[in-house]
Structure formats: C-alpha cells, structure tokens
Amino acid sequence: MLKKNEIVTVEIVDLTHEGAGVAKVDGLVFFVENALPGEVIRMRVLKVNKKIGYGKVEEYLEKSPHRNEELDLAYLRSGIADLGHLAYPEQLKFKAKQVKDSLYKMAGITDMEVPLTLGMDHPVQYRNKAQVPVRRVNGQVETGFFRKNSHDLMPIEDFYIQDPVIDQVVLALRDLIRRFDLKPYDEKEQSGLIRNLVVRRGYHSGEIMVILVTTRPKIFRVDQLIEQLIKHFPAIKSVMQNINDQNTNAIFGKEWRTLYGQDYITDQMLGNDFQISGPAFYQVNTEMAEKLYQTAIDFADLGEEDVVIDAYSGIGTIGLSVAKHVKEVYGVEVIPEAVENSQKNASINGITNAHYVCDTAENAMKNWLKEGIQPTAILVDPPRKGLTESFIKASVQTGASRIAYISCNVATMARDIKLYQELGYELKKVQPVDLFPQTHHVECVSLLVKRS
C-alpha cells in the first residue's frame, strides 16, 4: 500500500469529467491535477484510502503533445481555468466525449452520434459577468479568486476568461476601496463591509453594471467613490448595492438598492433587446449563448402554427427569440424579478404573443393543461439538477411532438432523457456547445421527438 509523500512513476490514462488526470497504481485509482492522458510523471502521493488516492506532479518525464504550455498555473489552482492546460481543439473533443459517456452511463444509449463541440474562435476573455471576493491578504485589500476547494484568496488582476474591461473595472474598484479605507469582509471574524464585487458588461451594448455586496447598508463616502469610478468608466449605467449580512456562501442577500442610474443594463441577443437586472440569470458567454439558443430553435423546427412552452425561462432570452416565428409562447420562471424582466423585455421588443408566469415549471405545466393550452413544442433550460420527474410527466401529458432540452449538466440531462424514452419519446440528436472554454463545463442541446 502506497503511503503519503511516497513518490512513484505513473502514466496518466484518462481525464475525469472535472479535468483531473487519472493514474492506476497497485489496484488504486489516483487523481492528479495538471496531468494529461499519455503523460508519464513522477507523482507524490498526497492522500490515499482503500480504493482511491490523490497525487501531485513532482516531475514530467513525458509530456502530452496536447498540453497548453502557456497557461499561468494560478488559473488552474484557482479553478478559473481547470481545463486550460489542455489545447483548445482537444477540449472540444473532451466535452463531446463527456456527452457520449453520460448518455451511455445514465441512459444506456450507445448508438447516438455526438458531433464535435461547437467552439469559439477566440476562447478567452469571453465572460460578461464577474463575481469577485474582496479580502485582506498580507495586510492589503485584494480582489481575486479563491484557491480551489478553499476560501483562501489568491490575488488575481487578469482573470483570463473575463471581458478585459470587466477586469479593469474590478481593479479600479479595488483601488478605490483601498483609497477610501473601506474594510473588506473577514469570514472568520464575521466583520468588515465589502464582501464581493459583481460586474456585468453587455457584450453588444458595452453597458456596465456594478454591484457592491456589503454586510450592512451604510457605505462611507459612496457617492464620491461612484463619481471617481464613472469618471474612468462612463459606460457604467447602473451601480447597485446588495446587502448580505448572513454567514453564507451565497453571493447575494435579499435587499437591493440602486446607488446610481437604473437597476438594469441593456444588451442584445438574437436580434432582441434585453433588460438585465442585478440578480437575473443571463448566460455569461453571449457569443456562444446565441449559438446554443439558435441550435435549440433549429432542432425544434418551429413554424408559425407552433405553440411553445419555454420552461425555466429566465429573463425571456430564448422564448422571446422564438416568439416572432410562432403562434404563442408560454414561459415559466420561479424568480419574480426575472418574470418582471421577461414581461418588460417582451414589451420593449413589441412582442405580444409571449406570456410569462411566476411559478415552478411543474405547477405551471399542470395549470396550462387545465386551461386547455396544448403546446406543439417545449423548450427546457433547467438548472444543474435537471428536471423533476413530475415536470417530465406533466410535459409528456401535453402531447407536445418535440422537446428541445438545453442542459448545463449532461449527467442529469442523460438521466432525464432515459425517463422521456420510457414515456414515449425518442432521442433524435444532440449537439454539445462550449459556453465555458478553458473549464470542464459543457452545455448540450438535445432533441426528443414523440414516437408516433
């Protein structure tokens, strides 16, 4: 049995779905960060139990030709870019394999062709939103990212996958917090004022929203701070404050205040204008979200006689994108602010055939059935936990001929596809889409068609 700190030579034979290298020694499976298939390394044993262990690269004896040697390892250690050490064309293959493997493991599907993941020409600096903790490190106020699996802040100035203008705003805020002597949050002591900085920037519009997440309402000289900030970044249209006084990992608390401008910014997606509020869900990679949604729309093959249900509708991005091409759209979202955004966004774009309710998706589906609404197509874009069994059964009862499923977790998507197949639907096609280059996350669109 290998012991902690022992060093052994191993070959990496696979990658986990989270991008860790896999090695096998004496019947044990070891997970090794920053190691790629085909590499031979000297591995230090960090931790070992009866079946699995964790190791660390001490030395590379043979490196993979697919290794990205230019990656700053801080991005790997923080989890900002946990797949950044793998060359981008190989990342796209890896993500397609994740989809194929999940369909096999969770749904027993072996014959589905999974095309190459749709990728980006410029797979960095794509994120339109930053959520950055503020802490004191070595006596200095810093912004950055937590080291993976910890709450130790690593000061970072260039976030690699974020819009560089957002990085500049974060650094300007950090410098102003230092200058105005505002106290950063101390998690252990439950003290300090500034917990997090959240910055959004419209991909097409360039409009910027800044959110100061604080432990209490009063921010000393906040008007002067905002004045200085806007002097450098006139594209700022909104400065919000969110008050979170709880001992929690959640970014936002319940109370919101508008400190400057309006409580939203505007951006465009697939030809529509969208108002995006502070807490609203909006895909962080606009360029690829447009490809993701267009793929779902194309899969569903929608026409002017179609009645469409848009489940987990967010601020209406996908439902309003299809509304101009179909008869009616019925959307449901559980977050009240997002439903208000959807209704406003429909109005802004002159769309009168899209109707939104605030409810759980399964409740709304049952109510629409009672009202005699009969959808021909359903678009679903659930959170990572996927669909509930009751939602799936309710959606089947509508008799919709096709379901386009947008997933941010291919394991739960495959699980849900299995149930849909048992209830009379057939998986026709899938398409992975890379919304999160340099990370292990993959989005996927699948099309389910009702068996005749």
What annotation goes with each model-predicted range?
Residues 153-195, 216-240:
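Internal alpha/beta scaffold segment
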Residues 21-26, 144-147, 211-213, 342:
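Short, acidic/hydrophobic/Gly-rich beta-strand patch recurrent on exposed beta strands
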Residues 198-202, 208-218:
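Carbohydrate-binding surface patches
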Residues 115-123, 187, 196, 432-435:
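Short, solvent-exposed loop/turn elements at beta->coil junctions and helix N-caps
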Residues 2-9, 17, 217, 221-452:
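Rossmann-like S-adenosyl-L-methionine
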Residues 1-74, 355-356:
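Terminal RNA-binding accessory module
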